[in-house]
From Swiss-Prot:
Homodimer. This is Ribonuclease Z. PANTHER family: ZINC PHOSPHODIESTERASE ELAC PROTEIN 1 (PTHR46018:SF2). Keywords: Endonuclease, Hydrolase, Metal-binding, Nuclease, tRNA processing, Zinc. Belongs to the RNase Z family. The lineage of its organism: Bacteria, Bacillati, Actinomycetota, Actinomycetes, Mycobacteriales.
Amino acid sequence: MIEITLLGTGSPIPDPDRAGPSTLVRAGGQVFLVDCGRGVLQRAAAVGVGAAGLSAVLLTHLHSDHIAELGDVLITSWVTNFAADPAPLQVIGPPGTAETVDAMLKAFGRDIGYRIAHHADLNAPPPIEVHEYTDGTVWDRDGVAIRVAPTDHRPVAPTIGFRVEFDGASAVLAGDTVPCPSLDELAAGAGALVHTVIRKDIITNFPQQRVKDICDYHSSVQEAAATAARAGVGTLVMTHYVPAIIAGQEDQWRALAATEFGGRIELGNDLHRVEVHAR
């Protein structure tokens, strides 16, 4: 079984009720943090997960709303890990991830120096290993396998989606993307597809062109549902709602998805949990 927890279902716009985009995936005793939106560590703490307990951080792309708390994750995983010889935190993402991680560590350089000077058992900077991929297998440990494929979030490029497999169960995390054949292939037959969604019917009515531009490189509810249908997935898990779902309108969003997808449809607030079993 794979357990999916929507840690943050929000967007770049700060929301008092929704953390930034982030999803927790647990499989075979391993814990993966997919994207690091604002507030992610507080949300993770609410389900008993700390930064030092992460098996890996998986980044779909390097937009600010998806990496806003990456620096905090890097530092907190270091200062809260009390192992004598802690294993490096694994960070997996598209090309550009290593540069981003290096820049964040540089930004925290003074803090890192202060802590090394103060604590005898912190004698080196945070141990981190960065792996950059656009396609193929990125993880294969103790029964858990993860592979990636390109998605289409242009002009943001490259971007990737992740497929996590364990004991016959599978979950795909699409990140931000418009429909594309590579995502269809990655998601084919998966137990669940976690997909960001926007309401283009609402967004196109905003007067600001910058807001309307969001429609260029995100999937609408119906487009995400159509991707799920083409791929033959069991469950569509919608997240990263733009605009934020107003309480009482959940059925409206489900109904839009149901016009394209006949399977199980999940959406909810932060900390919404979905179990994915072998198909």
